[in-house]
């Protein structure tokens, strides 16, 4: 196991991890969009896919402005969260119950990302990566907004439809 000796090493590790997470998510969101039966939910997943692609580009900008180099790694946490969503798609018929499950799976992803970006902002600030932190904060705010939209969808329509379908 490679030891991370400095806060700089930790920042690079965490940024590499979330980069992997975002790349994995770009593939998963397209599947979630196809699996959703509610047109608004499907569209929300497509919109977040575009946003996620922009977030990957933003990480590239962070790398450039901070003068760091990402490590090749796989975010196993995101892999597991995506697998949970994939299992729902395989096990539940398309409809309101699956939609409710997809919302829950997507919120787990958002909460992971919110935690990751929040930590990166705090560590980046300690390291003096002012421009990089600005970029990371922009992504953090997007993730929070997406989580809020998912909550609103669940409260407004998704979970109610799922309960009446049961």
Task: Annotate the PLM regions.
Residues 1-166:
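Amphipathic alpha-helical hairpins
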